[in-house]
């Protein structure tokens, strides 16, 4: 699930093959759906947003009720990259974020649980409510992900864009920010390089978060809108985190500064 950043103007395509070296003006976009496995409605919406729309990547909550079924469904779509959505604050297990040892142990456990469910390492790691960006936790995440050579959201040379979200100030719903028109404006504004656009689609049965369930259907509608897929095809090259090795051959020596825009 997403914690909305401060509202700022963002400058953020479809699956064209990546067969040539990256040029300085190339625009690559990962469209990642958070909360895979949270429940059946959320998982179905994510799979549909990939099959019929522009979603190229998802992040799995390994301890949630639909995790195993969601992973099975994802395997039927080989171009859908699946990463780990680390959760310390939702689900059956919670962690005291002030206890660094407990945080590390739980992160390692969730990584191993992901491998158990999928048979492979996650394409990337991100986290519920962006806890991996907390100053006291970021070094732990960075060190563990580097040791396993797994990209970490916001710390792997990919610009993170969190503006496609329907809830902003004081929890007020703003459907304008999950409309097809707004999504198209983000796509045409993508800057050169590699970017990630976060999203949270679901179908009408999504029940993961009472504060943000029915909005997921509006996200799904936008992500699968034919106008959006056309604009994406013309504006960017859609990729997932598996493609980073061809585009960013060496990880940055220092962790990039995480930015919500």
Residues of each region from the PLM?
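Terminal accessory/targeting
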Residues: 2-30, 40-118, 124, 132-261
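DG-centered beta-turn motif at the end of beta-strands
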Residues: 33-36
